[in-house]
Design a protein with these regions (language model features):
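Hydrophobic transmembrane alpha-helical segments of multi-pass transport and channel proteins
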Residues: 51, 87-91, 95, 222-226, ...
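Signature of multi-pass transmembrane helix bundles
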Residues: 8-34, 46-52, 77-248, 408-415
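Juxtamembrane helix-boundary/capping and inter-helix hinge elements in multi-pass membrane proteins
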Residues: 68-77, 163-167, 206, 242-245, ...
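Transmembrane alpha-helical segments and their short flanking loops
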Residues: 308-415
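Transmembrane helix boundary and interhelical junction motifs in multipass membrane proteins
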Residues: 59, 194, 265-273, 303-309, ...
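Membrane-water interface of transmembrane alpha-helices in multipass transporters/channels
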Residues: 40-41, 76, 208-216, 245-251, ...
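Membrane-interface alpha-helices at helix entry/exit sites of multi-pass transporters
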Residues: 74-82, 182-189, 279-295, 323-324, ...
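Helix-loop-helix junctions within the multi-pass membrane cores of secondary transporters/permeases
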Residues: 255-337, 395, 408-415
Length: 415
């Protein structure tokens, strides 16, 4: 009996998560149409969202605190350009996502009737909420899912630990972060069952029309990412190198983005990016640091996902979002995106943090996370491809910009 169960689990894990989620989505829709009264199927979705709600605050705290505690302060000045490019493009990605959300507003059907806790009227109230949440009690922040407070106290704790913590203590903190990340991976591994339950609840209550709305949301996400990859990033590269940027852009998309599309992991794509940097003639001392750094802080796709999903939640609840408030959201999404690296479903799990700026409850935010998992088969692949290709593009741009300042010619493929 035990051997049979182990064989089933092994077979389940051998199938790719993408395929399992697609199967779960289809089964959920079919069951909703065939037996709409089977409430136990919908409970699987509730359990999945509940597990995410339970682990997400702890995950954000330990990941951020551990990253700051382990961080190195010995970063050479010549990396300033590449860090600036990584951060600039991540913010621009979030800002462009805000603009496209205003141009093409999208709302979605959520499983439960959703309302916001507080509807902010403008930038002043948003900033007031932000500042108040920053210094909220850290225990209550973890319990209530106040991600602004969680981030603030995690940063304080991590920086303090970096200065006074022993190596053993820092190792314990890193191991704790790894352990929590492992729990998240276990939960994500059960996503097909959760997705089946979420799709069942939505289709049983609203019919197949929900997929039209999800399609619009997915089109907005992918369209914004493509605009960033093919228009904005090349323009920034052109400003630095004063040459046609597309040979570099297309080479990075082909050799880095394509692989990342299928691995769905910037961290897993680091060896691919290292090899590409070598082909591009970059300084190994430079790219050996800038590529792993890019996999952590160059998160254009994640910033787009967080921003668009948050504004979709606001549209769904009828919350008016002013342009200045959207700028604050863009900055928060860009900063939050930098913490998405190496976390399963990282950008999706940071949606509640951004939603909290507009008084959107944790329950509603986690329903948006569930929607994100439904469309994540495509969204996450495109997001990772954009992130990973950008790592090499801007590492190369920073290096080639230095070449130009030194009077050294650009590589032949850029002339």
């Amino acid at each position: 009996m035990m051997n049979g169960a182990k064989a089933i689990v092994k077979k389940y894990n051998e199938v790719s998560l993408i395929l399992r989620i697609v199967v779960g989505l289809v089964i959920g829709a079919v069951l909703a149409l065939a037996v709409p009264g089977a409430g136990w199927v919908g409970e699987l979705g509730s359990l999945f969202v509940g597990a995410l709600k339970g682990i997400a605050p702890v995950l954000v705290f330990v990941i951020v605190a551990s990253a700051l505690a382990q961080g190195s302060s010995k970063l050479d000045r010549r990396f300033g350009t590449v860090i600036w490019l990584y951060m600039l493009t991540t913010f621009l990605a979030a800002a462009i996502a805000s603009i496209t959300s205003f141009m093409f507003p999208v709302s979605v059907v959520l499983a439960d009737a959703a309302q916001s806790d507080v509807v902010p009227q403008g930038l002043g109230e948003v900033l007031s909420t932000l500042l108040t949440n920053f210094v909220a009690n850290h225990v209550s922040s973890l319990m209530s899912g106040n991600y602004i407070g969680i981030l603030f106290w995690a940063c304080m704790f991590g920086l303090a630990m970096k200065n006074i913590g022993s190596d053993t203590t820092k190792k314990f903190l890193a191991d704790t972060a790894d352990a929590v990340s492992q729990v998240v991976r276990w939960i994500i591994n059960l996503a097909p069952f959760g997705i089946m339950g979420l799709v069942y609840t939505n289709v049983a209550g609203n019919g197949l029309a929900i997929f039209t709305q999800y399609g619009k949301l997915l089109a907005l996400l992918v369209g914004t990412m493509l605009f960033m990859a093919l228009i904005v990033s090349p323009f920034i590269i052109f400003l630095y190198l004063r040459c046609n940027p597309y040979p570099l852009v297309f080479r990075c998309l082909k050799e880095s983005g394509l692989t990342a599309f299928f691995t769905r992991s910037s961290a897993a794509n680091i060896p691919v990016n290292m090899a590409l940097c070598e082909k591009l003639g970059l300084d190994k001392e430079m790219y050996s640091v800038s590529i792993p750094l890019g996999a952590t802080i160059n998160m254009d796709g994640a910033a787009i996902t967080i921003t668009i999903m948050t504004l979709a939640a606001a549209n769904t609840l009828g919350i008016p979002v002013t342009l200045p408030a959207a700028v604050v959201l863009s900055a928060m999404s860009a900063l939050g995106a930098c913490g998405a690296s190496g976390v399963a479903g990282g950008s999706l799990l940071l949606i509640p943090m951004a939603c909290s700026l507009f008084g959107i409850s944790n329950d509603v935010a986690m329903q948006m996370v569930g929607v994100g998992f439904i469309i994540g088969v495509i969204q996450d692949s495109v997001e990772t491809a954009l992130n990973s290709a950008g790592d090499v593009e801007f590492a190369a741009t920073a290096e080639y910009h230095q070449w130009l300042k030194q009077g050294k010619p650009l590589p032949d493929f850029l002339k």
